[in-house]
Amino acid sequence: MEGSGGDSGSMATPVQKKVHEAWRVYQYYLDKTTPHSTNRWIGTLVFFLIYCLRVYSIHGFYIISYGLGIYLLNLLIGFLSPLVDPELEVSDGATLPTRGSDEFKPFIRRLPEFKFWYSMTKAFCIAFLMTFFSVFDVPVFWPILLCYWVVLFVLTMRRQIAHMIKHKYIPFSIGKQKYSGRKSSANSGGGSRAD
């Protein structure tokens, strides 16, 4: 009995090793793309255009596009939302009182940029693959789906922008902020020492 159990385990081991090795290679190349955000987003834009051309050329799979749009809207909301929602923060009264202007809270996203990009790219690839199976081509009147998605997008983004204004946060930053000392006091201080 022990011999037969060991044989089945050893049969799966080479397969598991190959799968694990393939996963490591995949993860290696995925990690190499991390610092190249512009190139990653250009690649995702290419996937998006290929998907749009596919749907446009076959005039179908609108329900897949609608589901993809809802999923991308969900990802966008996660990307624009802070990790800790100020409305849900519970203060138990044990903290020291501080003024809002004195306290610095960096904006930390609920969904980081890399995971946002990765999920979005996977969604485009999966949706593209689904267009090759006719079972997913459900006949629908696409203008109704488009109107419903636009209304959903506008209402959701209005709520998100109101939340940003209410809690005074901006989810976008371009580059690293550069801080410099007060130059006027440094110049005046240097001039007073020359006596």
UniProtKB/Swiss-Prot annotation:
Spans traversing the lipid bilayer: 38-55, 60-80, 114-134, 135-155
Chief location bin: membrane
Pfam families, per database record: Rer1
Subcellular location(s) of the protein: Membrane
Keyword field contains Acetylation: yes
GO CC terms, sorted: cis-Golgi network; endoplasmic reticulum; Golgi apparatus; membrane
Keyword entries, A-Z: Acetylation, Membrane, Transmembrane, Transmembrane helix
Coiled coil: none
Gene Ontology biological process terms from the UniProt entry: retrograde vesicle-mediated transport, Golgi to endoplasmic reticulum
Annotated membrane topology: Multi-pass membrane protein
Residues annotated with N-acetylmethionine modification: 1
Family the UniProt entry places it in: Belongs to the RER1 family.
Protein function: Involved in the retrieval of endoplasmic reticulum membrane proteins from the early Golgi compartment.
Listed name of the protein: Protein RER1B
Gene behind the chain: RER1B
